[in-house]
């Protein structure tokens, strides 16, 4: 009996060794390096467009005595630039798509967050906390198409993201509402925080190309050398007067209560 148990244990150990040597890196596990970065806007903070919400008195009432602006440039101390999408370019081993949905909220007649990241195949979960109805409308070039009304205190809207792109989401009822979803095919992405920082963990070692994207200033890329178990730092800077690159989206909100005019550059 003892001999049989020993053989069984040896077989189990052998199988575990084979599995460990054939499996690729998995997000959330060790073996990779960490990329820590900072995104800055190097100049005076641009003036964000003023939003006129008179077309919906219920939205307008939320901002009595205030001057709401579009959160196009969210710049903090030392030029820290928030809401910049960060992702790694290239091909990576398959990893499980999270079963937890990414959440886009409608609150105070604005989308929140302004920019978020998600995996292809992940579920988008849109909620409405406002005292008014919304119409959630995607402007997709890759088949992530939806256009649906969401009533006051209505059930969440859910959609399984199908393809990679930077997806712009608007509201047909409130033309000033905009959000961007960076849909990617790997787990190595982030969005810069209020202090301009971002972190991507468990990155496979080797040369990696980092792409950042801002809705007005467009994309930038840098290549870094990631080492297992170590931290790699990288900084990105946008300059005043820099010509927006392909992929930037320009918005112009004019002082009119009925409609907002947008100029959208091709992505």
Roles of regions detected by a PLM:
Residues 1-4:
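Positively charged n-region of N-terminal signal peptides that target proteins for export
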């Amino acid at each position: 009996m003892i001999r049989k148990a020993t053989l069984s244990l040896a077989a189990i150990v052998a199988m575990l060794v084979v599995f460990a040597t054939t499996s690729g890196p998995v997000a959330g596990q060790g073996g990779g390096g960490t990329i820590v970065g900072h995104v800055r806007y190097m100049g005076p903070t641009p003036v964000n467009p003023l939003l006129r919400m008179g077309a919906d008195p219920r939205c307008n009432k939320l901002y009595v005595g205030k001057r709401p602006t579009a959160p196009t440039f969210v710049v903090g101390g030392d030029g820290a630039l928030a809401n910049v999408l960060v992702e790694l370019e290239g091909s990576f081993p398959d990893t499980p798509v999270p079963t937890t949905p990414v959440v886009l909220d409608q609150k105070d007649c604005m989308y929140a967050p302004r920019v978020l990241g998600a995996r292809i195949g992940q579920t988008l979960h849109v909620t409405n906390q406002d005292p008014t109805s919304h119409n959630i409308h995607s402007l997709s070039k890759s088949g992530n198409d939806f256009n649906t009304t969401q009533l006051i205190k209505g059930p969440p809207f859910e959609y399984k993201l199908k393809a990679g792109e930077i997806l712009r989401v608007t509201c047909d009822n409130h033309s000033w509402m905009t959000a961007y979803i960076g849909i990617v095919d790997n787990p190595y992405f982030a969005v810069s925080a209020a202090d301009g920082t971002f972190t991507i963990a468990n990155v496979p070692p080797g040369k990696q190309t980092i792409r950042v994207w801002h809705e007005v200033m467009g994309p930038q890329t840098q290549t870094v050398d990631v080492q297992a178990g170590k931290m790699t730092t990288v900084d990105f800077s946008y300059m005043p007067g820099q010509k927006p690159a392909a992929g930037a989206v320009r918005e112009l909100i004019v002082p009119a209560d009925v409609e907002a005019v947008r100029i959208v550059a091709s992505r």
